[in-house]
A protein has these predicted regions:
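Glycoside hydrolase catalytic-domain context in secreted enzymes
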Residues: 1-178
Length: 178
């Protein structure tokens, strides 16, 4: 989602469905480029589709993580008509197994390969930072996000997160945010 119609967690103006972007204010005076942040503990969570006009500008409300799409699901509103020359794009990301399952393999090479898949998709889709891997330990079984964390053992959790990060960082210009 973009602008006023964005959904929390999908507010990127540069990569539809990404969690957000950093400010553009530092490009001119400090030559610091925007960073695009994508969520998703089991691979990148991005919009599966979006549309752009004939000049390549994103058309707000056409991606599947927008309020425009949600109002259609609720039975309100009408499908947005695309302007002449608009193109619909698709960006399907790989669904990586959840962290707990990856840790249960006891194989840091497999976890690094999963990170490599995510890093390749980040490069391809222009995402700079992956808001993962989740780094916590399973202290309470009532925690609703334990599936995002590798283990209740801090050593196992750290080794797994490091392997995932190594896999992602095989690709220049992308990283994780443990």
């Amino acid at each position: 989602g973009m602008g006023a119609d964005s959904v929390v967690g999908a507010a990127s103006a540069a990569c539809p469905g990404a969690a957000g972007d950093t400010t553009s204010r530092m490009i001119a005076d400090r030559n610091i480029r925007n960073m695009i942040l994508a969520d998703g503990p089991a691979g990148l969570r991005l919009s599966r589709h979006f549309a752009a006009d004939k000049d390549g500008n994103l058309i707000p409300g056409t991606e599947d993580a927008s309020l425009g799409e949600m109002s259609l699901l609720a039975g309100k509103g009408e499908k947005k008509e695309l302007p002449e020359g608009a193109v619909t794009y698709y960006q399907y990301c790989t669904a990586i197994p959840i962290a707990t399952l990856l840790a249960q393999t006891w194989d840091v090479d497999v976890i690094a390969q999963a990170g490599d898949i995510v890093g390749e998709e980040m490069e391809e889709l222009g995402v700079t930072l992956w808001l993962a891997p989740g780094m916590n330990i399973h202290r309470n079984p009532l925690c609703g996000r334990n599936f995002e964390y590798y283990s209740e053992d801090p050593l196992v959790a750290g080794m797994c997160a490091a392997a995932d990060t190594r896999g992602v960082q095989k690709h220049a210009g992308v990283g994780t945010t443990i």
